[in-house]
Amino acid sequence: MARTAKRYKKNTEKKIPGIPVCMAAIYVRLSVDSDEKKSESIETQVTLIKEFIQKHNENPDKEYEIAVYDIYSDLGKTGTNFDRPGFERMMNDVRAGKINCILVKDFSRFGRNYIETDNYLEKILPFMKVRFISVCDNYDSFAPDAKNQELSMNLSLIHI
């Protein structure tokens, strides 16, 4: 009787695919302006994003699951530049391969400088294979219609 190599058996076994897990960073930011609304508070942003994650994970038709790696926050920091301790710590974790998904309440919490924000969303994060989700803007960078959603990003970043 001929021997069958194990490698051939592995190729014929039917594999049951698991649901991929996105290791996510929750990023929240609040500048200290007198006109900041209560709806923008750090706690409110975190709660909103966690509710989104819970609802997403409960969906039986989901293509991936979201697991929170850490919460990164910048209190009292402007969104017009990216020189923020919480943001830099998050990006260090992205570079270390600990995170492959970033969730924010809306684009303006990520950054208000259109050019730099666009650079992150269009070049840096895609190059690093990092999914970006803006909850209130209904934006997911891995969605098929992500390119069509850029207009809402452009409008929400206008700082008057």
Regions picked out by a protein language model, each given a short descriptive name:
Residues 1-158:
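Short, structured surface patches at the beginning of a domain
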